[in-house]
Amino acid sequence: MKKVAGIVKLQLPAGKATPAPPVGPALGQYGANIMEFTKAFNAQTADKGDAIIPVEITIYADRSFTFITKTPPMSYLIRKAAGIGKGSSTPNKAKVGKLNWDQVLEIAKTKMPDLNAGSVEAAANTVAGTARSMGVTVEGGPNA
């Protein structure tokens, strides 16, 4: 078992990681090979389009590293599905978009590996709640 020097969590555009900030300084402070990480990350996420990919990088004392990519943030998936640039600054008053229940279920299925929900329905309710907090109206569904 290798000794862990540090764990770094970043959100990077898929296939477009560069040694510039935030990647360089975050990995540089642990002495990890920045170019090696950017090449490996870009190769692994090249097929994900322009999504933002959360990544957890574990850096070991011998300067080697491993990383785990996760599914895109829920807010990104909701904005993409609703076709909006950003959520509402006043979600209880100003609504900025609409999602139907099928879109909510699709996002829930995408996020299922990263959510600690017991079922797709529970995950869908989590997605619907996040959408509402962003000022996106959810139409249909079990409690519409």
From Swiss-Prot:
Forms part of the ribosomal stalk which helps the ribosome interact with GTP-bound translation factors. Keywords: Methylation, Ribonucleoprotein, Ribosomal protein, RNA-binding, rRNA-binding. GO terms for molecular function: large ribosomal subunit rRNA binding; structural constituent of ribosome. InterPro entries: Ribosomal_uL11 (IPR000911), Ribosomal_uL11_bac-typ (IPR006519), Ribosomal_uL11_C (IPR020783), Ribosomal_uL11_C_sf (IPR036769), Ribosomal_uL11_CS (IPR020785), Ribosomal_uL11_N (IPR020784), Ribosomal_uL11_N_sf (IPR036796). It comes from Deinococcus radiodurans (strain ATCC 13939 / DSM 20539 / JCM 16871 / CCUG 27074 / LMG 4051 / NBRC 15346 / NCIMB 9279 / VKM B-1422 / R1). The keyword RNA-binding applies. This is Large ribosomal subunit protein uL11. It comes from the Bacteria. GO terms for biological process: translation. One or more lysine residues are methylated. NCBIfam families: L11_bact. Pfam families: Ribosomal_L11 (PF00298), Ribosomal_L11_N (PF03946). GO terms for cellular component: cytosolic large ribosomal subunit. PROSITE patterns: RIBOSOMAL_L11. Belongs to the universal ribosomal protein uL11 family. Part of the ribosomal stalk of the 50S ribosomal subunit. Interacts with L10 and the large rRNA to form the base of the stalk. L10 forms an elongated spine to which L12 dimers bind in a sequential fashion forming a multimeric L10(L12)X complex. Contacts the CTC protein (RL25).
